């Protein structure tokens, strides 16, 4: 497969390949590392521009990966284009998120700074839940009703995209359902408790990398009860 065909396939610009599944495309994307050189980077930038101009560029796992791969090459042409057209972040630019804090969150996730991204996510949720939640720095189970559905969906979307589908509330919900909503099994499955059913110590014993167990992040304090997270699973996703 030649390089133009390869990238067009990944970006879903070729309609005859539109039925290829997301993870199949992602497998192709990872193979790009074997082809990368300065000429190929320039070609990738051209196709990115074409995709954005045609309004066919979508915030998907593979496109997020490609965009980050492109940014990793310190070329003035790339830096100029990214600054001029994606200054709010790749996903924020395409999705037109209204909450400016999501730009900061996307920047942290894009840099694989999952520790700070987790803290910032909790901060956003507390602010969305209301001033009292923010002041006390945790939520009562009644506070979660103040958070609107779209905000949770947007947060979840960013986590999913920048972890290639490994993190996010929707991933956690899927695992929770897979263990018949048994919380202890859920916590063990996502790596919040150890084999002796003891809670991991924050922050040192948790994993802050994309290869952590599925659903490991973002963290949610379960010592105050499961209602808030259960409410998010049941009503927001």
Swiss-Prot record:
Subcellular location: Plastid, Chloroplast
Cellular component terms (Gene Ontology): chloroplast
Any one GO MF annotation of this record: tetrapyrrole binding
Domain of life: Eukaryota
InterPro entries assigned to the protein according to its UniProt record, in alphabetical order: GUN4-like, GUN4-like_sf
Keywords associated with the record: Chloroplast, Plastid
Classification via PANTHER family: TETRAPYRROLE-BINDING PROTEIN, CHLOROPLASTIC
Family of this protein: Belongs to the ycf53 family.
Name of the protein described by the UniProt record: Uncharacterized protein ycf53
Organism listed in the record: Cyanidium caldarium
Encoding gene (name): ycf53
């Amino acid at each position: 497969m030649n390089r133009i065909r390869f990238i067009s396939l990944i970006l879903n610009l070729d309609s005859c390949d539109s039925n290829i599944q997301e993870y199949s495309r992602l497998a192709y994307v990872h193979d790009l590392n074997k082809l990368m050189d300065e000429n190929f980077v320039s070609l990738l930038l051209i196709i990115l521009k074409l995709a954005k101009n045609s309004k066919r560029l979508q915030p998907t796992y593979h496109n997020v990966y490609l965009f980050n791969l492109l940014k990793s090459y310190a070329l003035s042409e790339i830096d100029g284009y990214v600054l001029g057209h994606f200054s709010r972040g790749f996903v924020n630019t395409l999705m037109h998120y209204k909450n400016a804090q999501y730009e900061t969150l996307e920047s942290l996730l894009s840099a694989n700074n999952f520790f700070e991204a987790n803290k910032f996510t909790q901060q956003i949720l507390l602010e969305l839940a209301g001033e009292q939640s923010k002041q006390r720095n945790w939520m009562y189970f009644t506070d979660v009703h103040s958070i609107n559905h779209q905000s949770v969906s947007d947060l979840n979307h960013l986590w999913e995209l920048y972890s290639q589908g490994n993190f996010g509330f929707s991933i956690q919900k899927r695992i929770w359902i897979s263990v018949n909503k048994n919380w202890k099994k859920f916590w063990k499955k996502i790596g919040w408790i150890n084999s002796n059913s003891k809670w991991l110590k924050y922050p040192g014993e948790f994993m802050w990398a994309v290869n952590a167990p599925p659903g490991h992040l973002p963290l949610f304090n379960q010592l105050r009860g499961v209602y808030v997270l259960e409410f998010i699973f049941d009503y927001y996703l």
